[in-house]
Amino acid sequence: MSEKKPKWPYPRIAYHPGKFERFSYRTYNWFENRLWPVRPVPFLALITTATGYQLKNFDVQDLQTSLHVVLKPLAISIGSVYACVFLLRHFLKYFFFSYKGYLKENPKKPSYWTIIWGALRRVLLKIAPPQLSSCDRLLPNLPLPSLDDTVERYLCTMRHVTPEEDYIQLIKISNKFLSSEGRTLQRFAWLLHKFSENYVTPFWEKYIYLAGRYSLAINSSIAHIVMYGDNDLTQIYQVARILYIETLANLSLDRQKYLAVGEGLLSTRHYRNIYNGCRIPGKECDHFQRNPPSRHALVVHKGTWYKVDTCDENGKLYSVDELVKIVSEMMNRNDKSTGFMSKIASLTTDRRTEWSINRQKFFLENRNNKKLLKVIETAQFVVSVDETDAWGVETVEKASRYMKDTLTGDGSNRWFDKTMNFAVCANGRGGATGEHSPCDGAELGHLCENFLNIDKQILVSPSREEQLENEKVLDEDRKTLKLAEKLNFEIVDGMESEVERCFESHLKATNDIHMHSIIFLDFGKGKLKTCGISPDGFVQMAIQLAYYKDQGKFTQTYESGSVRSFANSRTETLRPVTDASCEFVEAMLDEKSEKKIKRKLLKEACEAHVNNCKQIMMGNGVDRHLFVLCVLAKGLGYSSPFLDYYSSQKWLLSTSNAPNMTNSIDEDCSVNNIVLGGSFGAVAQDGYGICYRFGGNQAILMAITSYHSSEMTDSDRMAQHMKEAFHSLVALFDE
């Protein structure tokens, strides 16, 4: 019996849309997003039928001579039909999409309400399968927790990470906060909550991301890399595949045909920021510039930037083989930039205020460079053709170098303002560097999973010989294809010293990153499920044990949690340090503690972790609420010792679980199908950044970052503690 061939996650579009075509489908989608689960065509049909019914007794001559005879029945029909749709959508918004009862129940024993909710969900998916953003306006508003609950939960999370004397003082200032300025700030937060769909996201994006004056490289960038197995494509072919597949993804997102996760239950608001757009630096605050789907992408090779069109002059998308020839011709040119001009992209690694000043001076005030900057900032995405062939997974050193290079680049081959910078090394292995401010890691991971599904499982790869033959560029190809256009920047006074300064600064920051990539193949989540514990809870408890062994203490720990079931939401902080987790770690370090006690405490700690996850998913987080209160206090001129204390605490341990977004890749069929995951820089100078994911049922992938300049941390040492923790925790279930 033949295996079922994987399906494309989005349409294979043949042409780049013209202005009229794009206007047409965007207009349709505008109605779709305001009428679902009723489609625009049936909606118009109902209006037409209702209008015709009201006019059945009128003669055609009367209708032709008196327009108001038609307008009144038409207005009644539109009002009546839309009123029904309006009521239906409000029922769905406030009852169906707002229902979170299933999170509180045993999945094996659902309540009647959950059974009814599940049945309604199946009916909706059957009669009106949603497009990418069909349900976005139906998602409930992010709830505002009570002030007392938030402060109480915060104090619970700080009990084990704060010295006793400081904790007593924290309780005192929290009580004063609750009885004075906290109440006033909560009232302003309540007003924000009532008059906006999400009282957090606008503040979060502005003050956590766009107002930050730090360099985007390492501090805001996140990395994604691909499969464990060897790549069967040459570098040129892999670059062409990226250009082709990601152009299709870009156009599908714009058409709202991109297959979303969650079947309409999750916010897709930030997918529109993945392609075409660019973060624009400002002297005090950046902004994100969205652009319509572009016809070109950027390719950088040996420090030289090229505009590569992904369609011909008539808008017909180039095939992979045609793009292969365009990329091959580009790579074999003798027009490469030299000297400091080959490092011009390092300007984007600078602090944001300085980059804003240099952008104005070197680009906007120069007519030629301003034109080229527009080409860059409106491009779909960037693809870096890297010269290194050292990317691999054969050793820890190679895997760690692979992950680090994907995160940082070399200072000349990433335009960090762009949301997506893909990279392909000389041996054909690839990865991507994402800019975090316009979207979250889960959305970028979704994009990368879809790419891998198409690249490795759907498209057929030619033999090595066929690839090399197709890379040959004939005279006929030069006449019929639109070849890459080099971006020839003009030298401006002062540019050389600034480029060299930025490049050296980035090189120093890159060398300070201590990356250790763990590819743990001893077991995966399959083994953990047989133990009856949460896989994420298992890894988080292992992290807590490893950190305690590494530092001799518990610390405030960040884990990103999802609240995307609420409108325009991004992430919330899940705090893994609990009474149960600390009791478990202490038992593990106690030689006198029996194995059955340790096992019991591990299960309780994982259960507490799962319950915290559910609280986050229901909108009952702590940190985003307190963050908004901090912003309001500063804006309104309130002095708050409690909020000052909260905002001054460092995240010495920052973690993130990169979820499997699509389940489109069978990671259990072969070790070569394991997706290696991602990484990010440690948030604190003396802290660790830990990004992990499960490679199906057979692996745990983890990237640990710290800084060589810190005397407190060591990624290699922490990695050893992590592997020991994995084995010691699973050994509790040996019998």
PLM-predicted stretches and their roles:
Residues 1-418, 427-428, 435, 439-735:
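Long, Pro/Ser/Thr-rich low-complexity/intrinsically disordered regulatory tracts in eukaryotic proteins
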